A protein has these predicted regions:
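C-terminal/domain-terminus segments
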Residues: 133-166, 170
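Short, solvent-exposed loop/turn motifs
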Residues: 169-172, 255-257
């Protein structure tokens, strides 16, 4: 292993294995940790991990990176993700079209510095992602939880959770899981866990994504608290306005009964034609069970967001 730059700016967790000829370059400011490797990670032979300036390479716990990979710039790789061999991941891109008559080397450097000064986001690989042999991830792409990237693909845009993408440029060719709305979901059922993951989105073709939200025929937000029950039919505008007053909620409106909550800890957004919903949290061990009972047919899908744990309220 070859560690280049300020050693004190590199953090390696316990139980991690760094194999032969790995190069770790921390080119950030002296004394600032900009390259982090979590616990129980595996870094394969001849892999290069490089951070520079304010950019941080952050590899979370239980990540496996195979031989001959390059990870450079501002990159996050979250737990239990697998990178096959010969993968290139960067938060940047190259620029050659802004001033075509200038040398590519010069305009690329100038435009890249301009993008960095404006705060370019990181490239993010979420939990449980599998990236195939020889893939390239560029342009601050965000690979959603559970996604699969095919061998030798070039990813330049975000990938949805549990999607399977392949090609140059990478396009969606399938889904790892088929998220069909269920009449009931429970955190105690392993097959239902993906429905609780932040970022999961199930849309039917008629649903429309709009600025700062989603437009569904039915839309309601559910609050996780110590103990909470809902029993209502829909009033979209009333419910959305009520969620803004987050300290203590009492929902009343057209076709609605009421719902009260105190000490709100989290919000789950549900977009689905449902009629009855119960949340019951056991305060003694912080465990909770979420049951969603649908009274009508499924034609608008479901969207769950911002649950901080599966079966546990953080």
């Amino acid at each position: 292993m070859n560690i280049s730059g300020e050693l004190r700016g590199v953090s390696i967790g316990g139980g991690s294995t760094i194999q032969d000829a790995v190069i770790i370059q921390n080119m950030g400011e002296s004394g600032i940790t900009t390259l982090k490797i979590g616990s129980n990670c595996k870094i394969g032979r001849r892999t290069i991990l490089s951070s520079e300036g304010d950019a941080c390479v952050n590899i979370y716990d239980n990540v496996s990176i195979h031989n001959n990979c390059v990870v450079i710039g501002s990159v996050e790789i979250k737990p239990f993700s697998i990178l096959s061999a010969n993968i290139f991941i960067s938060s940047g891109n190259h620029y050659y079209r802004h001033v075509p008559h200038r040398l590519i080397m010069r305009q690329d450097k100038e435009v890249a510095e301009l993008h960095l000064s404006s705060g370019v986001r990181s490239t993010v690989i979420d939990e449980d992602v599998w990236i195939g042999w020889g893939a390239v991830i560029l342009n601050n792409a965000h690979i959603g939880r559970g996604a699969v990237v095919g061998a030798q693909s070039v990813v330049t845009r975000d990938v949805d959770p549990y999607a399977v993408v392949a090609g140059v440029p990478a396009r969606r060719v399938g889904d790892r899981l088929k998220f069909l709305p269920r009449p009931e979901i429970s955190s105690h059922n392993l097959e239902d866990w993906p429905y609780f993951y932040e970022g999961f989105l199930h849309l039917d073709p008629e649903s429309e994504i709009i600025l700062r939200g989603f437009r569904f025929r039915d839309f309601v937000s559910v609050i996780l608290s110590q103990r909470l029950e809902y029993h209502f039919e829909f009033s979209c505008s009333t419910l959305l306005k009520a969620v803004d007053n987050i300290k203590s909620i009492k929902i009343n409106g057209k076709d609605c009964s009421f719902a009260e909550s105190k000490d709100i800890s989290d919000v789950v957004s549900v977009c689905v034609p449902l009629q009855f919903l119960v949340i019951d949290r056991n305060g003694s061990n912080n465990a909770f069970m979420l049951s969603v009972i649908f009274h009508s047919s499924f034609d608008s899908g479901m969207y769950l967001k911002s649950v901080k744990g599966v079966g546990v309220v953080a």
